[in-house]
Amino acid sequence: VEFPNDDAVLSHGFRFRPAWWTSRVPEGWGDFLDQLPAQERRYHRIARADLLTAATDHGLPQALVAGYVWGTGSSAFLVGRRARVFRDNDAQRVDDSLHAVAETLRVGNTVEAYTSMLRGQSQNLKHLGPSFFTKFLYAADAWNGRPGRALILDQFVAAALKSVDGWDISRNGPWDSSTYERWLDHAHSIADVEGVRADAVELAYFTHGRKIASES
């Protein structure tokens, strides 16, 4: 697995159209999307750097939106299904939940924050599973454009953990708290040894896992 440099990590991004999302999220939550770099044909670009600053610059609900936009990219056909989290949860409940989770992160309880968002737990939101709520954790835990302890865990990272490290892990999740804690320990340990950002490890595993998925 080859680890990307800082510039490659921060520029990791996708094209999208703000209009796909602004009509599907609570009023005001998607306004920042029009501020992102514009491209042709009403497209804009969202990069990992934008995700890392979303919570600080715009707010926690906006960080959740940013994670969905970044994680969906140009796949317009997926937007309707993925935006159900905003349609089927009360906006105040979402806001309260995200603030509670962010406070748990702030005091250093990363795994507890993850646990609280799992199905059946206190901060769980309908339709919001680990692949996307770990994007929120990653964004909310960031500081000055760098990750905190929280990292993204999705199907591609899971596939790479199985392939590269031989983990007995389901590709599609959901993943229990002990698996998330193990992933964080593993990624941060590799980052220390290799002298790279922890999210460079996550991106390397994501890239490898996506390659595996495309070949299967």
Where are these regions (language model features)?
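Structure-specific DNA junction-binding interface
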Residues: 1-82
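C-terminal accessory module of base-excision DNA glycosylases/AP lyases that mediates lesion recognition
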Residues: 1-29, 134, 141-216
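Short acidic alpha-helix initiation/capping motifs at coil-to-helix transition points
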Residues: 39-46, 111-114, 181-182
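Amphipathic alpha-helical segments within well-ordered protein domains
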Residues: 52-53, 87, 188
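Helix-hairpin-helix/helix-loop-helix acidic hairpins
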Residues: 56-59, 66, 71-125
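Generic detection of long, well-ordered alpha-helical segments
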Residues: 57-61, 91, 177-184
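Short, hydrophobic/amphipathic alpha-helical patches that form generic packing surfaces
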Residues: 61-77, 135-139, 159, 203-206
